Each structure stands twice: as structure tokens, then as C-alpha cells.
Swiss-Prot record:
Active-site feature positions: E106 (proton acceptor)
Alphabetical list of Gene3D superfamilies matching this protein: 3.30.70.260, 3.40.50.1360
Gene coding for it: rpiA
HAMAP family attached to this UniProt entry: Rib_5P_isom_A
Name listed for the protein in its UniProt record: Ribose-5-phosphate isomerase A
Length: 228
């Protein structure tokens, strides 16, 4: 199976965990798109009744186009389960997210969810975080000074730009700075450091967050229990 087939596989597996009446956090990214399609099929074919809370405008639009009811996070009092993707997951089930420039909303939804599930193809499972650039969402005001501070700290930062040379904008109209670190040996320490930098709204380290990981492998989906 190619990578897209593996993504479709885990998307279909993940929606088996969605129960009637759930308030579901809906993530963002290429793998989640397959999950939303599979969820739409259950809504259509089984009459599944759920409320979705999306982590990006594009996920909300896709879900609504398939008949899934979407509400804002502030309109619900809890989330039963959030299903999202990840860019890297290490041996301790710590993750990097934000390749789709949605990690701020993703993290807000995740921390308000009773359970979190990540769905990935096998290429996302790594021994150490850091080969994938670590995204930071930063406010535009003073962002060049934030970039310079990060550079002086040795984090090898760069603004994420579009093909036309414009800043990539998040749904909150902020910029993305990617840190090209190579390897992250102490993710909790790094998270604390980044949390202390004025102008950084949120980083893409998702630590001690996920409960279940579904990995798309050539011989089928593998379900991993990360934490209770």
C-alpha cells in the first residue's frame, strides 16, 4: 500500500471508535481528511448522530459538506474524543504537530478532550522527535525580533512561506516559524523554554497528550495504547 492507502486505512479504523451521541474533536491534515470522509459515510449510512468541533476552518467545511454537525468549542461543555493526525510520534508517545499550521487550535481542542487519538501512517513513528521541523505560531507584530531571538538560541528558525513568497497565515491570522532542530532530546525542557518567549503563541510539541495511536502498516492498522 502507498502512503495514501495507509492514511485511508487508519481513518476508517478510527471512526469505529466514534459512538452515537459523542461530541467529537476533529483534527486537521492529510490523514484526518480520510477520517472525515469515513465519518461522513457512517453519518449517511448508519444515521450516526454526533457533534463535531473542528480544529481548522478547512476541516469544518469538509465535515459540514458531508452532513456532520459542527459547533464552536465554546458552544459545547466537553469533548468525548478528539481524532487528529501527527507529524512525528516518538517512542514515549510524545508528538510534533503543526505541519498544517493548525496546532494552536488543535492543542486547545486536545486539552479539553477526555480522550485523544492520533492516526498516522508508519512513517510518522520515530525514535526521537526533531527531524520534522517544530512549528511555532507567533503573532505578526515583532515577529522578526522573535525569529532573531530564536536564531541566537541556536534553534535554526525560518518563517513558513507560501509559494508566492507570502507568510503562511493560521486561522488566527498569525505567522508560523519552523525550528529545524534535527533531534530533540529533552522535549519537556524545550517546551518550557519556548513557553517563556514573548510573541510565541503556541509550539507544536504535544506532550503527555495522546491516549491511543492508530498506525497504518502494510499488514493492517496497529492500535497502540499510549496512556490511560
Amino acid at each position: 500500500m502507498d502512503q495514501n492507502a495507509l492514511k485511508a486505512l487508519v481513518g476508517q479504523e478510527a471512526v469505529k471508535y466514534v459512538e452515537d451521541g459523542m461530541i467529537l474533536g476533529i483534527g486537521t491534515g492529510s490523514t484526518v481528511r480520510y477520517m472525515i470522509d469515513a465519518l461522513g459515510e457512517r453519518v449517511k449510512n448508519e444515521g450516526l448522530h454526533i457533534i463535531g468541533v473542528a480544529t481548522s476552518d478547512r476541516s469544518a467545511k469538509q465535515a459540514e459538506s458531508l452532513g456532520i454537525t459542527i459547533k464552536e468549542l465554546d458552544e459545547v461543555d466537553h469533548l468525548d474524543l478528539t481524532i487528529d493526525g501527527a507529524d512525528e510520534i516518538d517512542d514515549n508517545f510524545q508528538g510534533i504537530k503543526g505541519g498544517g499550521a493548525a496546532h494552536l487550535w488543535e492543542k486547545i481542542v486536545a486539552i479539553n478532550s477526555t480522550k485523544n487519538m492520533w492516526i498516522v501512517d508508519e512513517s510518522k513513528m520515530v525514535h526521537h522527535l526533531g527531524a520534522f521541523p517544530l512549528p511555532l505560531e507567533v503573532i505578526p507584530f515583532g515577529s522578526s525580533h522573535v525569529l532573531e531571538k530564536l536564531n541566537k538560541m541556536g534553534f535554526n528558525p525560518s518563517f513558513r512561506m507560501t509559494d508566492t513568497g507570502e507568510h503562511v497565515l493560521t486561522d488566527s491570522k498569525n505567522y508560523i516559524i519552523d525550528l529545524h532542530l534535527g533531534r530533540i532530546d529533552h522535549p519537556h525542557d524545550l517546551a518550557n523554554t519556548l513557553n517563556g518567549i514573548v510573541g510565541v503563541v503556541e509550539h507544536g510539541l504535544f506532550l503527555d497528550t495522546v491516549n491511543t495511536v492508530i498506525v497504518g502498516r502494510q499488514d493492517g492498522p496497529e492500535v497502540l495504547n499510549a496512556r490511560d
